[in-house]
């Protein structure tokens, strides 16, 4: 994520290029309560370490959470003293999951870790196995959607992406040799969206051909992949649907892949402190109310446990 970006909820345009950035820069934004004169007890501050791709949706989720009474799985209000979330100050640090994980291991005082994948929360549990017998298990709070995007082509005539339609798209370029058609995807070794895009192309028997002909441009992360496609540096790009929705891209410019055609892009979180609101907020993330916000932002819903 670009270091110039200090996230403020009114900057949605910049959030697109920063989402899933995978960089080592850390950006912090606060959602501050109306507590009297700003005097907030430590128990009224919830510190969240969040993957950069959540910068466009998490502020909305936090606002909704603070606007309602404390949530529990049974849909019942808990102790009245603990139900006013508007008095809770929530501090969010956005960065790559890897950097956040390193900060947590170095003792950073986070209460909740929201990763861009399932690997880091699982690794945290493994590390804590011998020291914290009461550690909570990871939970899945979001499932990303993959899309093929072209900023200068009309993709509306194509109803579904398969081997035949991909060959037509990637080999047809007016007034140019077919080998000049470039496609970008995020680094499959580092980015969940890139790994899923690679798996999709392999399933359609197109990955090796594109790679061997040097037409497959590997971006550092999903944010850079979006930038390449958005600026027409490449003809096509495998990007996150949430990026397209955030950027208000016309639907005719992209195709959403069928969810069953690539490995699920699941994002897990884990409570890493005894803060009561950390558990409460983690449960809210999995609620129908929060999931509807994720769906509006371009994610697939997660079944409420």
Question: Positions of the model-derived regions?
Answer:
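Bacterial N-terminal signal peptides that target proteins for export
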Residues: 1-9
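Short helix C-cap/helix-to-loop transition motifs enriched in small/turn-promoting residues
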Residues: 130-132
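Exported/periplasmic ABC-transporter solute-binding proteins
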Residues: 20-89, 93-94, 98, 105, ...
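Residue-level signal for mature regions of secreted extracellular proteins and peptides
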Residues: 13-14
């Amino acid at each position: 994520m670009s270091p110039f970006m200090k996230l403020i909820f009114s900057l949605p345009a910049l959030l697109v290029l920063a989402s899933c950035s995978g960089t080592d820069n850390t950006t912090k934004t606060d959602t501050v309560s109306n507590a009297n004169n700003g005097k907030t007890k430590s128990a009224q501050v919830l510190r969240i370490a969040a993957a950069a791709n959540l910068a466009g949706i998490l502020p909305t989720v936090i606002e909704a959470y603070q606007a309602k009474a404390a949530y529990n799985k049974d849909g019942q209000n808990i102790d009245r003293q603990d139900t006013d979330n508007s008095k809770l100050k929530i501090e969010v640090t956005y960065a790559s999951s890897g950097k956040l994980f390193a900060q947590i291991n170095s003792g950073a005082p986070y209460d909740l870790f929201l990763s861009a994948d399932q690997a880091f929360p699982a690794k945290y549990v493994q590390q804590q196995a011998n020291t914290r017998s009461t550690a909570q298990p990871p939970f899945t709070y979001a499932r990303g959607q993959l899309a093929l995007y072209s900023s200068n082509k009309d993709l509306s005539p194509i109803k579904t992406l398969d081997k035949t339609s991909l060959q037509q798209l990637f080999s047809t370029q007016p007034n140019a040799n077919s080998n000049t058609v470039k496609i970008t995807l995020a680094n499959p070794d580092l980015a969940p969206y890139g790994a899923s895009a690679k798996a999709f192309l392999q399933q359609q028997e197109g990955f090796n051909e594109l790679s061997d002909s040097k037409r497959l441009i590997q971006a550092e992360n999903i944010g850079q992949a979006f930038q390449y496609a958005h600026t027409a540096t490449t003809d096509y790009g495998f990007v996150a649907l949430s990026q397209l929705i955030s950027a208000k891209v016309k639907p005719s410019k992209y195709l959403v892949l069928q969810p069953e055609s690539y490995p699920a892009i699941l994002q897990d979180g884990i409570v890493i402190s005894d803060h009561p609101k950390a558990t409460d907020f983690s449960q809210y993330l999995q609620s129908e109310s929060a999931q509807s916000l994720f769906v509006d932002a371009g994610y697939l819903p997660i079944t409420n446990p």
